[in-house]
Amino acid sequence: MKFFDYNKEDIRKTLSIAWPAMLESFFAAFAGLVDSLMVSSLGAYAVAAVGLTTQPKFIGLALFIAANVSISALVARRKGEGKREEANKIFATFLVFIIVAAIGMSILLVTLADPIIRLCGSEEATHDSAVLYFRIIMGGMIFNCIQMGINSAQRGAGNTKITMRTNLVSNTVNIVFNYLLIEGHFGFPALGIKGAALATVLGTVVSSIMSVASVWKKDNFVSIPLILEQKIKPCFDAFRNIIKVGYSVFAEQILLRVGFMATSLMAAAQGTQAMAAHQVGMNIMGLSFSFGDGLQATAVALIGYSLGANNPELAKKYGSICRFIGGCISVVLAGLYLVGGGWLYGMFFEEQAIVDIGIGIMRVIALIVVLQISQVIYMGCLRGAGDTLYTAIVSTISVTIMRTAGSFFFCYVMNWGIIGIWMGVVADQLSRLILGSVRFKKGKWMKIKI
């Protein structure tokens, strides 16, 4: 069935949820890019130092990302089933879990920051700055975990405009305090990389407050006043539901980060300039991912609702609409990256050697973005239906094996250096696209109960 055969109401409903979700994800990625741009004023070493913290940070967040996928899928399904009280029981259990887990994880990562960053391949020029940045970011991770968790529940309920506003304000706070604290403006101290970390934490503090406020309304599908009024308590059955959907996502996240860490180590081994160019490339690729991520969140909400309402064909239709929209966006982005790659890198670095490396990276990213957005949507559709074991297997094959092996082959065997590492990313994205699309089209995911 072609896109134009869908009725206007299905397309309108998809776009009404998709545009805030895409805008939210885009501005989060854009804030990361601006963060790198402002940090680049300190030198290539600072960009590389921040880049070294990315993978260990996400390993620390793996448990919470898995829980977020669970709560989003479960809330969407319960909304489709019309079971508001059960959804809030799951939400109450989820909140207690992430708060306790975030405190424990934060203490652990701050304590072990030095050996963790050394394990990530830091050099003398980047180690101390990376450790400082990592400690501050992970010290404030509880605020990040709270806002991510509540926003995931809101997305599952289809409230993407609420999460968009939360993240827009958070990212604005981050950028403003980056300006004030990195180099020191309007009487604020020039704190360098420490200022960048503090600005990020301040942004998450604001967003966590806004997120909590968003569920403090009785008419929301997930609502703290409702939980208190009806004396809904966390329970083991709800926790078991969260684990059932999320355990394979957690395994997937860990295996993903093993693959990402391996390629990050290879990039770090290419030297500070190559690592700096690589980090900016990752941030730029994050911009394209943001569109897929927004459409993925849309697919989770609509597919979960449709399956909960016992309408699997409508669920598949929504997934196809999201993928078509994503495909159109990816073609536009690929063209922009091909034409504007040198200009983008010129904003970050004065050193022509780094800009030249970046132009090569951007040519590869132009290919990656076409594969990436579609695979993210397909995989999001499967996760939203609860087919998380399959997505974990696909991620293991694609990222942990294909990406790592491909990066090693092109980087060292073919001697392509940092560009070879990005060819490994192409192999990863292509593998996930093929395996995700085949599973989606077969339709087995429509029969999964969660």
Where on the chain are the PLM-derived regions?
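Transmembrane helical elements of multi-pass membrane transporters/channels
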Residues: 16-35, 136, 170, 203-207, ...
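Helix-terminus/linker motif at the lipid-water interface of multi-pass membrane proteins
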Residues: 30-48, 117-124, 180-191, 254-287, ...
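Small-residue-rich hydrophobic transmembrane alpha-helices
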Residues: 47-107, 144-163, 275-341, 372-396
